[in-house]
A protein has these predicted regions:
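Short hydrophobic alpha-helices and adjacent helix-cap/hinge residues
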Residues: 1-120
């Protein structure tokens, strides 16, 4: 099992990339990370809400809104090749202090001050 191997290697942490397979298993992954005392972070906010240590990534609602605007423009006849490339501009940081405490970690006050949400 991957988490057991990470625990044996005394890994300092793990970063989970956004992936539909992993996203649907956020609770299980957060529980495994906790069981093996491995700090885990992800880009998606619901990972921290599910028990992961930290999430930092795009705001899904803002990105979905932009996708809808582009879809509307294409449906009205604009060519996709003519639309400018855009990148996300809104990001959020979520810190799960309950998980940090369970892992024996202290989150720096500067991180907490920048967090959009702190789960206690």
């Amino acid at each position: 099992m991957a988490f057991a191997s990470l625990g044996q290697l005394q890994a300092g942490g793990i970063v989970l990339s956004p992936d539909p397979f992993l996203n649907s298993r956020s609770k299980q992954l957060a529980a495994l990370a906790s069981a093996y005392t491995i700090p885990a972070i992800s880009e998606l906010r619901f990972f921290a809400a599910a028990g992961g240590l930290i999430s930092y990534g795009i705001v899904d609602i803002a990105l979905s809104r932009q996708v809808g605007i582009y879809a509307g423009r294409i449906l009205k006849g604009e060519r996709p090749a003519d639309l400018p490339i855009q990148q996300p501009t809104k990001f959020e940081l979520v810190v799960n202090l309950k998980t940090a405490k369970a892992l024996g970690l202290t989150v720096a006050p500067s991180i907490l001050a920048r967090a959009d949400e702190v789960i206690e």
